[in-house]
C-alpha cells in the first residue's frame, strides 16, 4: 500500500 511504498524508498 502507500505506506509500504514510502518504506521502500527509505
Curated annotation (Swiss-Prot):
> What InterPro entries does this protein map onto?
Tachy_Neuro_lke_CS (IPR013055)
Q: Which UniProt keywords apply?
A: Amidation, Neuropeptide, Secreted
Q: Which GO terms describe its biological process?
A: neuropeptide signaling pathway
User: Got a GO cellular component term for this one?
Assistant: extracellular region
Q: Give the domain of life.
A: Eukaryota
Please state where this protein is localized: Secreted
Q: Which residues carry this modification: Methionine amide?
A: 10
* TM helices/strands, residue ranges: none
Instruction: Please state the protein's primary subcellular location.
Output: secreted
Report the family membership. Answer: Belongs to the tachykinin family.
Function comment: Tachykinins are active peptides which excite neurons, evoke behavioral responses, are potent vasodilators and secretagogues, and contract (directly or indirectly) many smooth muscles.
The name under which this protein is listed is Neurokinin-B
Amino acid at each position: 500500500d502507500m505506506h509500504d511504498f514510502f518504506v521502500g524508498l527509505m
